Amino acid sequence: VEGALQLAQIAPDLAIVGEEAKTREGEVIGLFITGRLRPYMRPEQVMDQIHEMGGLTYLPHPLDRRRDHFRAERIVELADRIDIIETYNPWCEAAANQAAASLASDLGKVSATGSDSHSARELGRSWMEMSEYADPKGFLENLRHARHVITAESGTGRRA
C-alpha cells in the first residue's frame, strides 16, 4: 500500500490505492484507501475501516467455492456496507459468476468485472471501460454505467 500511496502522490490520475484484505469470513478489497487494512478482522470491521478512510468496498469472487468467499446470506446481511460486487472473475466457475451477478442485481449494487491478474500474461483479458471521475463517489456512479469487456482469452476456469 505504501508504494501505491507514493504513486498516487506523484500521478493521482494513474492510481487508485487499494488492498485486498482477508477477513474471518472472506476477502474484501478497499479502493481509494489512505492506509493499510487490518487483516483477519470481522468483515464489518474491515468494511467500516475502508469507509472511514473515504474508500469503497469491493467483494472479489464473492461466491467462488474454491476460495475464501462470503455465503450469499452473509452478503445480504452486509449489503449496507458493500459498494461493489465482482460479477465476473476469470478464475471462478461460470455458475459462481452468474450467481454473483444475480445477487448484485437483487441488492442494487454496482457490479464489476475483474481480471484477478497475478502475472503480466494475465493482463488485458477482462476489464471495464468507464467515464472519467473526480472522486470515489463519481467512480462508483460511473462504474455503474461502465462497459464490461471479457475477451475470449479470459475464459472461466482454473489458472494454468
Mark where each language-model region is:
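Short beta-strand/loop segments at the ligand-binding rim of alpha/beta enzyme cores
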Residues: E52-Y58
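Cofactor-binding loop segments of dinucleotide-utilizing enzymes, especially the Rossmann-like FAD-
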Residues: P62
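Charged catalytic cores and adjacent phosphate/nucleic-acid-binding surfaces used
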Residues: L5-R38, E44-D48, E52, R65-A160
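Conserved beta-strand positions in the central sheet of alpha/beta enzyme cores
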Residues: Y58-L59, E86
